[in-house]
Amino acid sequence: MVVRIGLYRMVSWVKHQLTARNTGGHGIHSPYLFEWVRMVMSDKNSYYAWRKIEECRNKMLSDNREVEFVDYGSGRVQGESGKVKTGSGDWRKVSDIAKSSLAKKKYAQMLARLVHWLGTSYSPENSSETACGLEFRGLNIVELGTSLGVTTAYLAAVDSRNKVVTYEGCPAVAKIAQANWKSLGINNIECKVGEIDVEKLDKELERVDVAFVDANHTYASTRAYINILFGKMHAKSVLVLDDIHHSAEMERAWREICDDERVTSTMDLYQMGLVFFDKHYWKRHYVMNN
């Protein structure tokens, strides 16, 4: 099954390369999305906080501790218990988890730029009225699939006024993530541990400004998560779905998201898909390199 998924992704990558545009924004007619490409995808500036987060990533990549590992979301072969079978039973090295599950540096930093961009162009949905006018009260950010917390740290470090709620299925991995945030001095993250319950998720979430979904890589679970999140998002929200070409199931889910009447524009970066909801713009799907 692992070999089959690998071949599937290779074919998907070739198809993507044959149709993808560059990241300069050429061919994007929406001023809003053109600005998004310029400020988020094409920006190569780095920030001090990012260096600390990358030091944390490198620490995880060399961490040989073994932890009891439960994975509800990789899409790999599972045993009768629902737990993914790994080469060493239910125990894995932290370094192996880091290698297989952490978002690449460029994508994690792109997500941070996305949060920054939305925060600097905030709207009444995430503002409160004061004597001096509208005052930014922070973004509500949701992450499904915490892993070791590196991407979570990027999402949260942008602005301490933002609130990040992240969901992680494996208690041992969540514990390491929480220790990482503490060492980085990041205090605006709430981590919910355990398998994601869709009904509970629906009750817990209110307004969502940014969502990053990197959880259960099956069609049914992905669609269930997306349906809940769509109901919490507004015109200026952005949803990011990871691993959209991971398998036929994930590609099916991604195609249905692109066709959803609630969605206006989508961007396929191969590794990730981005979803926009502003009804002022024509419905359009972009395939782009990053």
List where the protein language model places each region.
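A short alpha-helical cap/connector motif
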Residues: V2-F212, N216-V238, H245-N290
